[in-house]
Swiss-Prot record:
Primary localization class, coarse: membrane
Compartments (UniProt record): Cell inner membrane
Reactions catalysed according to its record: K(+)(in) + H(+)(in) = K(+)(out) + H(+)(out)
Record-given protein name: Probable potassium transport system protein Kup 1
Membrane topology of this protein: Multi-pass membrane protein
Entries under InterPro entries matching the protein: K+_transporter, K_trans_C, K_trans_N, Kup
UniProt key word Transmembrane helix: yes
Pfam families documented for this protein: K_trans, K_trans_C
GO cellular component: plasma membrane
Family of the protein in this entry: Belongs to the HAK/KUP transporter (TC 2.A.72) family.
């Protein structure tokens, strides 16, 4: 009984978070699919063919690929592109560069989606006010801007207080959406022919080029499917699957069937079939409910962007940024000020640049289809490397999906000149940023490793009794380093400038595992190097906060007890100088240095006590 109750609670939560985006697609998907074929009048067979395409897109891409297959391809319960990438990197042999590029491409495309989704969904909901009264037409964009500004403003306060309402509100949305669709199916029962895939195939065959263009709009029905996989860790596989089959899929199917039947009976309703299905007395409540649903969908995408960025930082794809927890009970509720500001300006720019959901819908789709293609390619590697499927089995299983998604991608590429270039530019920008950071840090590590002094040699030299030996002082010093085999720069500079060495010196390395979380018993390890030097290692999962001060307490089991007030933390601060011979172009050197300078201070990122931190600087030519 308790398990059943927990399943229901998690399923309800997933309705609000996981399915918010795909649940708002009926607002505009069918409307946009009708536009390319409506210039010379739309026949009944064309309408049935369109609805058939939508239903089968939901069935093949969402139900089969995501709900039934990808939810099983988890990294210790976590999903998402970067989580899958981290899992594959463990056993990758010889083609890590390809996997890395695919991973950052998927992540970059998701960021583009996170900008477009709030703008498109909120605009499409608020535009329903035009049908309430045409006098409000000029206020659609200002109202949408105010709603979006409020949404981004409250992020720093956290959404814990209102997140409990997300599931119930979105459930009401799906019930209303499914009910209004069910009612209007009676307008023309011939719409049930849409379940026959013959009508979908016939539409594409008969329409030719226009049919390919229409596919770009049909794909809007499955936008948000990536959220199923990305939010796997928050809710688990069974609740997400249960919510899809009992609530979301039936409601979406009923609504699309209802819209199709409604337009078959009322061809003049093609301008906005979703809202026109509602009677006039219910139109304003429907607009309000739709707006609430789009706000919740936008919140889910923003939260997903925060989570994805944290993963990218911990995996070394982005520089450190400030990360704040907005809930004492939910570790997944985080706030990244830099990402929030970037998304806010990006969303505002899109609203003002396009001005309507109709115009913005042309830009939508490329980022989502691109991300889906990336996920399918990574899934192929997953089947081979993790499930040990023969290559031809894996190819045979995923080739139909890959071909279908590639066709959708091609259809969306036709919209580049109408605004489709926007998500491509956004994704390209973030690919360059992540590639530059990864490449720059690798070059920096190689250069410093080349000039660094091996730690073992250093310990022998300082512990040798001589008149040049540093003065021994009481207390404990912890030196943070990324390379435990080399002497930390801060330790060298401390001896060079202060001529002292503490009684106890700990060389601390912080590593990020290719798993979401690391058990506490595996978090820390100790290796004694000499009487005065000890090597410490902390290991965190890519979904965890790297709180060094808190993790120090775990060393007690190894017989080490740290008194924070008598312990000094030594950090090296590098002043990077560009070098024409670095291996990167000059512009990339400059970008890497700018990213490094923008990174948050390590003492803040690792939660070190600020009054116990000593930073020692050095120049490094990159």
């Amino acid at each position: 009984m308790e398990n059943a109750r927990r399943l229901l609670v998690l399923a309800l939560g997933s309705v609000g978070v996981v399915y918010g985006d795909i649940g708002t697609s009926p607002l505009y998907a069918f409307r946009e699919a009708l536009r390319p074929v409506s210039h010379d009048g739309v026949t009944d067979v064309e309408i049935i063919g369109l609805i058939s395409l939508m239903i089968w897109a939901l069935t093949i891409i969402v139900t089969i690929k995501y709900v039934l297959f990808l939810l099983r391809a988890d990294n210790q319960g976590e999903g998402g592109t970067l989580s899958l990438l981290a899992l594959l990197m463990k056993t990758a042999n010889g083609h890590t560069a390809i996997l890395f590029f695919m991973g950052i491409a998927g992540a970059a495309l998701f960021i583009g989606d996170a900008m477009i989704t709030p703008a498109l969904s909120v605009l499409s909901a608020v535009e329903g006010l035009k049908l309430v009264t045409p006098a409000l037409s000029d206020y659609v964009v200002p109202i949408a801007v105010v709603i979006l500004l409020l949404l981004f403003t409250v992020q720093s306060k956290g959404t814990a207080a209102v997140s409990n309402f997300f599931g119930p509100i979105t459930l009401i949305w799906f019930v209303v959406m499914g009910t209004i669709g069910f009612v209007h199916i009676a307008d023309d029962l011939s719409i049930f022919r849409a379940f026959n895939p013959y009508y979908a195939a016939s539409f594409l065959f008969n329409e030719g080029y226009v049919g390919i263009v229409v596919l770009g709009a049909v794909f809007l029905t499955v936008t948000g499917a990536e959220a199923l996989y990305a939010d796997l860790g928050h809710f688990g596989r069974r609740p997400i699957q249960w919510a899809w089959f009992t609530v979301v899929f039936p409601a979406l199917t009923l609504n699309y069937l209802g819209q199709g039947a409604f337009v078959l009976k009322n061809p003049e309703a093609m301008s906005d079939p979703f809202f026109l299905m509602f009677p006039k007395w219910a139109l304003l409540p429907a607009v309000i409910l739709a707006t609430a649903a789009t706000i919740i969908a936008s919140q889910a995408v923003i939260t997903g962007a925060f989570s994805l960025t944290r993963q990218a930082i911990h995996l070394g794809f982005l520089p450190r940024m400030a990360i704040f927890h907005t809930s004492e009970t939910h570790t997944g509720q985080i706030y990244l000020p830099n990402v929030n500001t970037l998304l806010m300006f990006g969303v505002m720019a899109l609203v003002f640049l396009f001005g309507s959901s109709e115009a913005l819908a042309t830009a939508y789709g490329i980022s989502v289809t691109g991300a889906m293609v990336v996920t399918t390619v990574l899934s192929f590697e997953f089947l081979r490397m993790r499930w040990n499927w023969p290559t031809w089995w894996a190819a045979g299983a995923l080739l139909p999906l890959f071909v279908l998604e590639f066709v959708f991608l091609g259809a969306n590429m036709l919209k580049i000149h109408d605004g489709g270039y926007v998500p491509i530019l956004i994704a390209a920008t973030f690919i360059v940023i992540m590639w530059t950071w990864k490449r720059g840090t690798a070059i920096l590590h190689a250069k410093t490793r080349h000039i660094d002094i091996p730690l073992a040699s250093f310990i022998k030299s300082v512990e040798r009794q001589s008149e040049h030996a540093p003065v021994s002082v009481t207390g404990t010093a912890i030196f943070l380093t990324s390379d435990p085999e080399s002497t930390p720069a801060a330790l060298l500079h401390n001896i060079k400038h202060n001529h002292v060495l503490h009684q106890q010196n700990f060389i601390l390395t912080i590593r990020t595992a290719n798993t979401p979380k690391v058990p506490k018993e595996e978090r820390v390890s100790v290796r004694r190097l000499s009487e005065r030097f000890t090597l410490l290692e902390m290991k965190f999962g890519f979904m965890e906060t790297q709180n060094v001060s808190q993790a120090l307490g775990l060393f007690r089991k190894s017989g080490l007890k740290f008194d924070i007030m008598s312990t000094s933390f030594y950090l090296g601060r590098r002043k990077l100088v560009p070098d024409a011979q670095s291996g990167m172009p000059h512009w990339q050197d400059r970008l890497f240095i700018a990213l490094a300078n923008a990174a948050i201070d390590p003492s803040d990122y690792f939660r070190l006590p600020t009054n116990r931190v000593v930073e020692l600087g050095s120049h490094v030519i990159i």
